[in-house]
Swiss-Prot record:
It comes from the Bacteria. Keywords: Aromatic hydrocarbons catabolism, NAD, Oxidoreductase, Plasmid. One of its GO terms (biological process) is gamma-aminobutyric acid catabolic process. It catalyses: 4-(hydroxymethyl)benzenesulfonate + NAD(+) = 4-formylbenzenesulfonate + NADH + H(+). This is Putative 4-(hydroxymethyl)benzenesulfonate dehydrogenase TsaD2. Involved in the toluene-4-sulfonate degradation pathway. Does not discriminate between the sulfonate and the carboxyl substituents and can also be involved in the p-toluenecarboxylate degradation pathway. InterPro entries: Ald_DH/histidinol_DH (IPR016161), Ald_DH_C (IPR016163), Ald_DH_CS_CYS (IPR016160), Ald_DH_N (IPR016162), Aldehyde_DH_dom (IPR015590), Aldehyde_DH_Superfamily (IPR050740). PANTHER family: SUCCINATE-SEMIALDEHYDE DEHYDROGENASE, MITOCHONDRIAL. It is an enzyme of class 1 (oxidoreductase).
């Protein structure tokens, strides 16, 4: 049991924590038990307008702060975040359900992301272009795009908020973050660490009715940049809103990651890595390996090993030290995943699963073997502890089947064949590819998708560029 007292946070507006004034409130629940933790007060229309007003004022000051000072302030915020890791991790496990070990890891990853962006603030360079005229100079400048409206989800609330906070603040922008109402306390604790080192209004945190918040922020002339991580349908809607108001937007949307396992792969190592990666956070990850295309020559051995490892996972409350996989985040997610499994089994898939606790929002970690290509699980993102496996007879067939899907976020390949690596790296339609490993998301490299998985990148220099505008100057003496 956690000794951390859980309380839903207030809103952070203008450097001050204040209660939301919306008439509607939301109950935050512990996914491991289904019991209520606290009641969250939401932002009213007046709260949203106040946040917009103060973010504009803060931007006018923050954009002029030297990059070295922005870096130093963010690094002090990161130090506070690391000092508070244990408390924040407990809050995250209570409200989201993931294991405490995973929550600690997420807090560390969020700190690494913000630290990288802080350092990158000192490396925002322009360039000098050789002049066409005598006594003249042509230069290119980079400058902050302006106030940012950011929307982050509940599955990795710290990391996916940190990607937005770190880049925007380091670039010299102010930011209004609408974080997920399901996981408010952990994000608020992280934001508070940054806020204590920043001028009032540079970072603001809201919780509210999603449609009301997105409409108010994106339609406002104050906001100059939008960034969103979440589902494809919501991403489409926000893209339409942003287009209507000519706002730049970065979208990191769903994923249904293919894994191509060639005949020369080390089965034991592949299964060990992929079971860890697949069932992390109960499979609620857009980059989770989900569709396994396995060389027919090793398919039987692979399915047996993966199924055995899946059944051996210890499922339970995230606070228990022995737990390897916690619950899914909500009753709605539990019902959706169970429905997808049932429809896919009805279509011919063979399930391999284990028992789970009856209380709380638990779904058994499940391998669906011998899955027909037209089964629902092959096209619908599970966003839960479900993996599916099908055999292939040629690499061309595997690549074609992997690409036969609207998503294109992450992909995985296991082989020692240089020819296979070259073919898959060129032809697999994904934004990130890991070969013989799991590393598709690190602070210093761009992360983003293709097709229905969105556009634009977070992290890496590309992620920093998303918060910058470009100006050309031609000066004649």
């Amino acid at each position: 049991m956690s000794t951390v007292l859980y309380r839903c946070p207030e809103l952070l507006i203008g450097g001050e924590w204040r209660p939301g004034r919306h008439e509607q409130r939301l109950v935050v629940r512990n996914p491991a038990t289904g019991e209520p933790l606290d009641e969250l007060r939401l932002a009213s229309a007046d709260d949203l307008q106040l946040a917009l007003q103060t973010t504009q004022q803060a931007f006018e000051h923050w954009r002029q702060v030297p990059a070295h000072e922005r870096c130093a302030r963010l690094e002090r915020g990161v130090a506070r975040l690391r000092e508070n890791t244990e408390r924040i991790a407990h809050l995250l496990t209570l409200e989201q359900g993931k294991t405490l070990a995973e929550a600690r890891m997420e807090c560390a990853m969020a700190a690494d992301l913000i630290k990288w962006y802080a350092e990158e603030a000192r490396r925002v360079y322009g360039r000098v272009i050789p002049a066409r005229l005598p006594n003249s100079r042509m230069e290119v400048f980079k400058f902050p795009v302006g106030p940012v409206a950011a929307f982050s989800p509940w599955n990795f609330p710290l990391v996916l908020s940190a990607r937005k906070l770190g880049g925007a603040i380091a670039a010299g922008c102010s930011i209004v973050l609408k974080a997920a109402e399901e996981t408010p306390a952990s994000v608020a604790a992280m934001v508070d660490c940054l806020n204590q080192e920043l001028p009032p209004g540079v970072v603001q945190l809201l919780y509210g009715v999603p449609a009301e918040v997105s409409q108010a922020l994106i339609a406002s002339p104050v906001v100059r940049k939008v960034t969103f991580t979440g589902s494809v349908p919501v991403g489409r809607h926000l893209a339409e809103l942003s287009a209507r108001h000519l706002k730049r937007i970065t979208l990191e949307l769903g994923g249904h990651a293919p894994v191509i396992v060639c005949g020369d792969a080390d089965i034991a190592r592949t299964v060990n890595l992929m079971v860890q990666h697949k069932f992390r956070n109960a499979g609620q990850a857009c980059l989770a390996p989900t569709r396994f295309f396995v060389d027919r020559r090793i398919y039987g051995d692979f399915v047996d090993a993966f199924g055995a490892a899946t059944q051996a996972l210890r499922v339970g409350a995230g606070m228990a030290a022995e737990t390897q996989m916690g619950p899914v985040a909500s009753a709605r997610r539990q019902a959706a995943v169970q429905d997808l499994i049932a429809r896919s089994v009805a279509a011919g898939a063979r399930p391999v699963a284990s028992a789970v606790p009856e209380a709380g929002y638990f779904v058994a970690p499940t391998l669906l073997a011998d899955v027909p290509l037209d089964a629902p699980v092959m096209s619908e993102e599970p966003f839960g502890p479900v993996a599916c496996a099908v055999p292939f007879d040629s690499l061309d067939q595997a690549i074609a089947q992997a690409n036969h899907n609207p998503y294109g976020l992450a992909g995985y390949l296991f082989t020692d064949s240089a020819k296979a690596i070259l073919a898959v790296s060129e032809r697999l339609e994904v934004g990130s590819l890991a070969v013989n490993g799991m590393g598709v998301s690190v602070p210093e490299a761009p992360f983003g998708g293709v097709k229905d998985s969105g556009y634009g990148s977070e992290s890496g220099t590309e992620g920093m560029e998303a918060f910058l505008d470009t100006k050309f100057m031609h000066y004649v003496a």
